[in-house]
Amino acid sequence: MDSEASDIEAELSDSVSAGGEEYIDDDDYTEDIDDQIVTAKSSRRTARRSVPKGVRTSKRIRDKELSVEVDEDYDEEEDVLSPSKKRHLHTRSMDKRQVAATASEKSDIGDSKGNDGEIEDGILEEEESLEKELNRGGGKEVEKSEESYYAQNDVGQKGEEEQDGESGGYEDNEPSISKESDELVSVVNGNGNEEDDEVEATKENTTDSTRSTTTRSKMLLDLLEDGGSKKKLTDEEIQLRRAENARKRKNLSEKRLEEEKQDTINKLLKKRAGKSRSHLPNDDEKNDGSSSFVKPRRPYNSEGMTRILRRYEEDLFCTF
């Protein structure tokens, strides 16, 4: 066994010396590959962070920026690497190609998304321009028809007919809005050329909306003119109103004075009634059956009055 092992070692040494190549350890090779993978990931992250959000760049500019950043990262790492690891730099050149390929794929995806967004923006701008033109043309026709309608009908029937028209306008407006939304979805998805149908739907929607707004505004104007309009008064009418107001104020002041006088009289009478000597029965005494006799309301020392005092022994008659 020892002889066979020695023969194999001798053959390997001869092959190395003849070919001029050195033996590479597998452990060192795997470590170098791991380092290369880590550097490739870090370079991709830096390339992603370098591009600011919301800025659209072309495909060529992105490829240039990515290649420059990757080369700088690898140059810095090559200066730091030991001479034993510099043997396998050919693998890093392969990694650079892979990074560039992935970056180009991402840029293609971003460009495709940007193109889709530009197409959608163009469609929306065309629709807005069509709606503006239709609003300008349709508003004049609606105003003419409504003026003739108001001229024929009476003022009393305006409110009821306009309310009925508003309710019908809202009901007709809902299906037109749903049609327009379906047509917009089909245009964005690219399901066919339906520009004529779009124009018709926008015409219906604009006419309904303009009718509802004009009817509302005219109703409000009619109400304001009927209820809120003030009549212009002449100088004579103003003077008459001022005289009426002054007369009313005088009457009020006289009533207040009379009420105050009556209050003072009542207060004085109450004070004077409390000073009388005669015993005035209360309400409770009046209700009792025992208080049948009511004394006269006059003082005892009045002239011409006789008073009888009856005792057990004698009766006394007193005169004043």
Swiss-Prot record:
A Gene Ontology cellular component where this protein is annotated is:
Ino80 complex
Record keywords, A-Z: Chromatin regulator, DNA damage, DNA repair, DNA-binding, Nucleus, Phosphoprotein, Transcription, Transcription regulation
Residues that the record marks as modified (Phosphoserine) are: 67, 129
Compositional bias of type Acidic residues: which residue ranges? 1-12, 22-35, 68-80, 117-130, 161-174
Q: Where is the composition biased (Basic and acidic residues)?
A: 105-116, 131-147, 244-264
Gene Ontology MF terms in the entry: DNA binding
A Pfam family found in this protein is PAPA-1
Renumbered to this chain, the Basic residues biased-composition regions fall at 42-59, 268-278
Q: Where is the composition biased (Low complexity)?
A: 207-217
Its localization reads: Nucleus
Q: Which residues cross the membrane?
A: none
GO biological process terms on file:
chromatin remodeling; DNA repair; regulation of DNA-templated transcription
What family does this belong to? Belongs to the IES2 family.
Q: What does this protein do?
A: Component of the INO80 complex which remodels chromatin by shifting nucleosomes and is involved in DNA repair.
Summarize subunit and interaction data from the UniProt record for this chain: Component of the chromatin-remodeling INO80 complex, at least composed of ARP4, ARP5, ARP8, RVB1, RVB2, TAF14, NHP10, IES1, IES3, IES4, IES6, ACT1, IES2, IES5 and INO80.
Could you share any additional remarks the record makes about this protein?
A: Present with 1470 molecules/cell in log phase SD medium.
Q: What is this protein called?
A: Ino eighty subunit 2
